Amino acid sequence: MNLPANTALFTPSWHAELELGYGRFDDSTRPTLRRHKGPLRVQKHLYAEGPEVCQHIIVHPPGGIAGGDRLDISATVGADAWAQLTSPGAAKWYRAASPAFQQLELHVQPGATLEWLPQESIVFSNAQAELSTRIELHGDAKLCYWDVVALGRPASGERFEHGHFQSHLDIRRDGTLLWHERQRIIGGDGLLDSPIGLDGRTVFATLLMTGEVGSELLEACRSLSMPNPVRGDLTQLPGLLVARCLADEALHARAWLIQIWKCLRPALLGREAVTPRIWNT
């Protein structure tokens, strides 16, 4: 029997959900909620820094996000708890005939700290990636959030010529907007090579950390020695520090973010930085 020519159109898409919660119990942070639907999971919680900081590694077993897929992730960190969320490898957004979505919702209660530190997102040419992130901080909650986006696959000779990458990020504290950003990058657009855009770089990264630091620490971060060419800088806004960089490789951008995170974490979050072991694998 001959198969119809459009069989590929019937490839199923994933609608995956992950809901996490964390609470403070005496001197430790423990998971209070772990619910999933579809292929999103978290591995066993870790305590590399001791019982106060609960680390979870979010995994997406299919390994990539295709057209029609939808990932919904939510996490709530209860009062005085500390959660650190990361990933074992890059998220890959594949070429597709229809959009794929990721929705992220994070809530951080008074006295709590959340670190959202995933590895990079690789957006293939012809992908249609659409991300929406909403973060609600309450009282004196603390946050460190970063993202690294790599457009195309230059090592394979693939430029980001078609498709789009779209993201929307809101951060609020007690209902007051701290940070609002919308991005839409079109494959093949002139801004990819323009000096007022990505200036020919294929990777861009952002780190946002709540709090304020003095000029001396800012200069110390700016003067960090990096072995690879990364164009980056930091800006102190009221209640929020912003660090951005452009690079030719995701590895270089991530190395820069890690250095900035190590420099700022003691002052803004109150703990020395301990690099998650998963980043070294």
Swiss-Prot record:
Say which domain of life the source belongs to. Answer: Bacteria
Its primary localisation, in coarse terms, equals cytoplasm
Lineage per the UniProt record: Bacteria, Pseudomonadati, Pseudomonadota, Gammaproteobacteria, Pseudomonadales
What are its GO cellular component terms? cytoplasm
Q: How does it assemble?
A: UreD, UreF and UreG form a complex that acts as a GTP-hydrolysis-dependent molecular chaperone, activating the urease apoprotein by helping to assemble the nickel containing metallocenter of UreC. The UreE protein probably delivers the nickel.
Q: What is the role of the protein in this entry?
A: Required for maturation of urease via the functional incorporation of the urease nickel metallocenter.
Instruction: Offer an example of a GO molecular function term for this protein.
Output: nickel cation binding
Q: Which UniProt keywords apply?
A: Chaperone, Cytoplasm, Nickel insertion
In its UniProt entry, what is this protein called? Answer: Urease accessory protein UreD 2
Q: What's this protein's family per the entry? A: Belongs to the UreD family.
Location of the protein in the cell: Cytoplasm
PANTHER family the UniProt entry points to? UREASE ACCESSORY PROTEIN D
